[in-house]
Regions:
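Juxtamembrane helix-loop boundary signature in multi-pass membrane transporters
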Residues: 1-8, 101-157, 266, 270-287
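Membrane-interface interhelical linkers
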Residues: 1-12, 20-21, 26-31, 36-66, ...
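Structural signature of hydrophobic alpha-helical transmembrane segments
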Residues: 1-14, 56-73, 112-128, 175-187, ...
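Membrane-embedded alpha-helical core segments of multi-pass
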Residues: 13-17, 44, 72-79, 99-107, ...
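Membrane-helix interface/capping residues of multi-pass secondary transporters
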Residues: 30, 89, 115, 174-175, ...
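Juxtamembrane helix-start motifs in multi-pass secondary transporters
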Residues: 33-34, 92, 177-178
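Alpha-helical transmembrane segments of compact multi-pass small-molecule transporters, enriched
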Residues: 39-45, 95-109, 184-188, 228-231, ...
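Hydrophobic alpha-helical transmembrane segments in multi-pass integral membrane proteins
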Residues: 45-55, 104-119, 157-175, 224-239, ...
Length: 287
């Protein structure tokens, strides 16, 4: 039951990170927000080590999975933004989340994870809920292009592989793999931000006159994203990769709930149904 709680909490915290990232992206390009928040997340993880709340042992296995996870994290995010740029977001965003949950679930099956029939029903309901929660219907909804679908699937695969890497890291390594994933992600995306500035694709004046709010939202994005990584690692060390991963894929839930209560945005009927399915399926998995 604890792993179910941690998996569901992971989805809410990831969703909170996406919410703050979306707010920051109103003033800056998403790639800039992601690059800066990656380093904010690394600072947060470093503070966890210094405070003694977590420990990290950089064993060969932890380093290997951290490097692989960091590369796929950068890959998944780049594919995700490409998919959103092509659109439609209302289809490609939940598609990415669905694939991100399926990839670790398939890996879990290969690792020999088996469940009772009720748990399989609950897992299937969660995957349906993942798509419904992220899907926003409307009159202007169009079918995605093959290229958009490819980028959406690529984003989900990248995120899913990161979850597998975090699961495969030795428990004795503490949060070493999480730190390495964040470090490599920060180097790749932070390097891209520097490249944008050097080549003047983004003017340095972009950051002038921003005020504290965008910087605080980027800081929050990195902190919540790294916090979700920690919760996921704690979850898979307590229970099943499949269960924790499919619950983690519900991360759009946290985003839309904050949008509903903070920004007063209305929920579509499909999203309300998805939320109900998610809560019901989570209860089934817990009991």
């Amino acid at each position: 039951m604890l792993s179910v709680i941690l998996g569901f909490a992971t989805s809410l915290v990831y969703g909170t990170a996406d919410f703050f990232g979306a707010i920051a992206s109103r003033r800056l390009k998403p790639t800039l927000v992601t690059g800066i928040s990656a380093w904010a997340g690394l600072l947060f993880l470093s503070s966890m080590l210094v405070s003694g709340l977590f420990q990290a042992t950089f064993s060969p296995a932890a380093i290997l999975w951290g490097i692989i996870g960091g590369v796929f994290s950068a890959f998944g995010l780049s594919m995700f933004y490409r998919a959103l740029a092509i659109g439609p977001i209302s289809i490609l965003s939940p598609l990415s989340a669905l694939v991100a949950g399926l990839v670790p679930a398939i890996a879990g099956a290969f690792l020999g994870e088996r469940f009772g029939w009720l748990s399989y029903v609950a897992i299937a309901l969660v995957l349906v809920a993942v798509f419904l929660v992220g899907f926003v219907p409307g009159q202007d909804v169009r079918l995605p292009s093959p290229q958009g679908v490819l980028f959406g699937i690529g984003a989900g695969v990248g995120i899913g592989v990161v979850l597998i890497c975090l699961h495969n890291a030795p428990a004795s390594s503490g949060i070493a793999t999480v730190i390495l994933v964040r470090l490599i992600n920060g180097l790749v995306l932070g390097g891209y931000v520097i490249f944008q500035l050097v080549t003047r694709r983004v003017a340095a004046s972009t950051f002038k006159g921003l005020g504290p709010k965008p910087w605080l939202t980027m800081l929050a994005t990195g902190v919540f994203d790294s916090g979700a990584n920690l919760l996921f690692v704690l979850g898979v060390r307590q229970g099943s990769l499949t269960v924790v991963s499919v619950l983690t894929a519900l991360y759009p839930l946290g985003t839309i709930l904050l949008a509903r209560f903070v920004l007063k945005e209305k929920l579509a009927l499909s999203q309300s149904i998805g939320i109900a399915l998610a809560l019901g399926a989570t209860a089934l998995l817990a009991f």
